[in-house]
Amino acid sequence: MPKKISAMDIYKLLPKTNCKKCGYPSCMAFATKLLEKEATIDQCPILNTPKFEKNKKKIIELISPPVKEVWFGNEEKKAVMGGDEVMYRYQLSFFNPTPIGVDISDELSEEEIKNRAKEIENFVFERTGEKLKLDFIVIRNASGDVEKFKKAIEIVEKETKMPICIASLNPEVIKEALKVVKSKPMVYAATKETLNDFIKVIKEVKKDVVLVLSSNNVKDLKNMAAKCLANGIEDLVLEPHTYPENIAETLDLNVMIRRSAIEKEDKYLGFPILNLPINAYYYALKNECPISGFFEDKEVVAKMFEATIANTLMNRYADALIMHGMDIWELMPVLTLRQCIYTDPRKPQAVEPGLYPIGNPDENSPVILTTNFSLTFYTVTGDFEKDNVTCWLLVMDTGGKAVDVSVAGGQYNGENAKKLIEETGIADKVSHRIIILPALAASTRGDIEDKTGWTCVVGTRDSSQVGDFLRNNWDKILKEWKEKNQTA
């Protein structure tokens, strides 16, 4: 098992001047942030001086993860892979969400290449406030023609700012392609038989690249990586073969590589893993697969199978994926799973507490109280917008906990509600003193009424039911409250 590094180990190598030039109040604080990957070593200007050169190298060795962080792309967009330190997310966190690339064949017409490249770059959907996108474009030399390949590369780089992977098993084709590539590309792929030729090509062209090493044998991948490192090629990616007909074999290879890197500290296997769900797509077009019986359309079957394989591989250490399908229904589950896997379990997923107007609320609009757990917030606001709900949404600071959890933990309470009402000035924006609570928070009604002096109404269990609840009840609730308070 790798040695556990502490902030004190890093602190001992820092200047200890507490100059604050790094942006943190002390060297110990900076050491802690370095350990947590929330700061970079270049933020300390003193470490960049000749006097601290050796210390800087030692710190880099200490904080470098067992799986090397590798990137390709350009100044505007980079695809970053690897950087993980643990086998399981609960042990720390996973870093650098798996870049997902989609292929473009050089057999397509120039217009088709241009359109597909734009489609890949512009693909986006939003979930819980985060925009989920594709990360790179794979240009395949399907034609075998060098000129077509070079032209496709030029079109993609001209039309988009996406990082690119150039894919050919022929080192001579790659050599010519590298002459026209402007950015730092990922090169797919060198095999055991062609590795020497690829090393020669990279040295001749003198181009900064990420080289993919492809083999179905872990020992061969290790030997290939050792040879590359000996030749000064350090940005490597390992590609154990992806077997759609027997995906368990690929999963075993992924686990063996990652376990060797993290638990056995094998530096020759400490590189990102690339998997190819695209193989599953083409396999399913020509062969029966586990989901063939569910759909008649072969294309639909192939894309469903590709997405299934992609998710399976991402659950077992795939640091980058290459796919073919572009349908939203295929990519949405893959990108959603990626977002979930790479959520940092050490940090609550929270939004800023405060007052959020939904629609165009006025003085007679309802006031609804929820929590600042991000999934709750975005689900609630999404449901409200779909159902044309107009209201004032009060978002309480519950430490990023959901309604039922914060009620049980005591964060959803009268004191916090009172503080929120005072800080947001909601009392000046409405003519009533009514707060609608989620049904799951019904037990806090008395406490909130006592602490705030507002009347609490228990609403629905689910935010999708709020629209109907307000349309059927709000006017009556408001009228009764005004009559009661005018009488009083």
UniProtKB/Swiss-Prot annotation:
SUPFAM superfamilies: Dihydropteroate synthetase-like. Binds 1 [4Fe-4S] cluster. GO terms for biological process: acetyl-CoA catabolic process; methylation. Keywords: 4Fe-4S, Cobalt, Iron, Iron-sulfur, Metal-binding, Methyltransferase, Transferase. It is an enzyme of class 2 (transferase). It comes from Methanocaldococcus jannaschii (strain ATCC 43067 / DSM 2661 / JAL-1 / JCM 10045 / NBRC 100440) (Methanococcus jannaschii). InterPro entries: 4Fe-4S_dom, Ac-CoA_synth_d_su_TIM-brl, ACDS_complex_subunit, AcylCoA_decarb/synth_gsu, AcylCoA_decarb/synth_gsu_arc, Dihydropteroate_synth-like_sf. This is Acetyl-CoA decarbonylase/synthase complex subunit gamma.
